[in-house]
Each structure stands twice: as structure tokens, then as C-alpha cells.
């Protein structure tokens, strides 16, 4: 099945490059291009793509606000969003994830990781660039540690294994290969971890793993 994508970036050359990269993959179809946040919001609401690929810093509305309006907790029928940017500041990463983004990549991530993130988002999964996850954990380590939240129920042995790999920035597919289990099994474990830990995304799972010295 073809994954329909809207690409939003205010830099014409960058946007054209992203469209060209995605156009090389038969399973992906770019159905719209936006040069600012207002246009991105309008196109996404009208075209209902499978994935919105959006830059953080754009005129009109920034990528975080666009994400919040199409994928936030108050949205009844959210769109999958992957945020891509040259700015790797922690507030952008956390802001995007809290707004509902399913992926966060830096623009130097490379085509393969970009396509993986789009496929993951369309499948209801999430992919955060491993270098972003590692840096977030390093930043997290610098603050005064808080008492970690106790899980609602004890984690199973398999959930503990998945927890550590998520904290390393691994995708569900990579975890499935490492543990010799199906992709759906990994997704179930990640969903269970989020429920038990009260985590909203994979970064919060990773932060909990760090706080409890799992990694």
C-alpha cells in the first residue's frame, strides 16, 4: 500500500530535495508540499495524508504547533507526524514529541532513516534518531535526578529487554530482529511499557530506563 505524504519546509531547496528522495521509493507518494506552517496545516487537514513530514522552524506556524493541531492529545483523528530539522535543541525535540510527533530526525540523518521513520509513523510506530535519543539522555543525566515513577505492574523479563533497546534508540524492527520475535510482539511490549510507566512516547521510556539505571 502506498503511503501518502505531505512535505512541509520553508526552504525551497530542502523541500525539493526531500520530495526527490521520497519520489525514489515506489511505496511513498508525495501528495502535497507546503512552504509555511499555515499552508502545512491546511494541506494536512484537506488531504488527510498518512504522514506529515514537517520542519520545526517555519513562518506562520512552527512545526511544533502544526503537530499539536493535527496530532495532539485533543485531536480526535490524528495524523502521523515526523519532524525533521537542522536544529537539535532539546526543547525542540521534547516539544515536538509532547505535541504528538511519532518521529524526530535531523536533516543529516540520511534517506534510509528518513524512509524508515515515515514507514514507522504510518504503521503507528515511532522512530527517533538514535543520536537524538542519546543526547536527550545525556542532557537528562545533567539534571538533578527525580524519584522514578513506579510502574503500575512489575515489568516482565521480556519488557525489561525491550526497555533497554528502546533506550538505545532502536526501532521496533531492530528490536524484533535482536530478540527473534515478531514486530507485532515488540509493539505489544512497547505499548505495555508505556501503559505501565505512564510514558507518552519512546523518549519518556528511555528516560525512565536511565533514571532506574537500566542503561
Which residue stretches match the model-derived regions?
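The feature encodes the CheY-like receiver
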Residues: 14, 54, 59
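Recognition helix of helix-turn-helix DNA-binding domains
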Residues: 169-204
Amino acid at each position: 500500500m502506498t503511503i501518502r505524504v505531505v512535505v512541509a519546509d520553508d526552504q525551497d531547496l530542502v523541500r525539493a530535495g526531500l520530495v526527490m528522495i521520497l519520489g525514489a521509493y515506489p511505496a511513498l507518494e508525495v501528495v502535497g508540499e507546503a512552504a509555511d506552517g499555515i499552508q502545512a496545516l491546511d494541506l494536512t487537514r484537506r488531504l488527510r495524508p498518512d504522514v506529515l513530514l514537517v520542519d520545526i522552524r517555519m513562518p506562520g506556524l512552527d512545526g511544533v504547533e502544526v503537530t499539536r493541531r493535527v496530532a495532539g492529545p485533543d485531536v480526535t483523528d490524528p495524523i502521523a507526524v515526523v519532524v525533521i530539522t537542522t536544529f537539535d535543541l532539546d526543547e525542540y525535540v521534547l516539544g515536538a514529541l509532547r505535541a504528538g510527533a511519532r518521529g524526530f530526525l535531523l536533516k543529516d540523518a540520511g534517506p534510509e532513516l528518513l524512509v524508515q521513520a515515515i514507514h514507522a509513523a504510518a504503521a503507528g510506530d515511532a522512530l527517533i534518531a538514535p543520536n537524538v535519543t542519546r543526547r536527550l539522555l545525556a542532557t537528562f543525566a545533567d539534571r538533578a535526578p527525580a524519584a522514578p515513577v513506579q510502574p503500575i505492574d512489575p515489568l516482565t523479563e521480556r519488557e525489561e529487554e525491550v526497555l533497554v533497546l528502546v533506550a538505545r534508540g532502536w526501532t521496533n524492527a531492530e528490536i524484533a530482529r535482536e530478540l527473534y520475535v515478531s514486530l507485532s510482539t515488540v509493539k505489544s511490549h512497547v505499548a505495555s511499557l508505556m501503559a505501565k510507566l505512564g510514558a507518552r512516547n519512546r523518549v519518556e521510556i528511555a528516560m525512565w530506563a536511565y533514571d532506574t539505571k537500566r542503561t
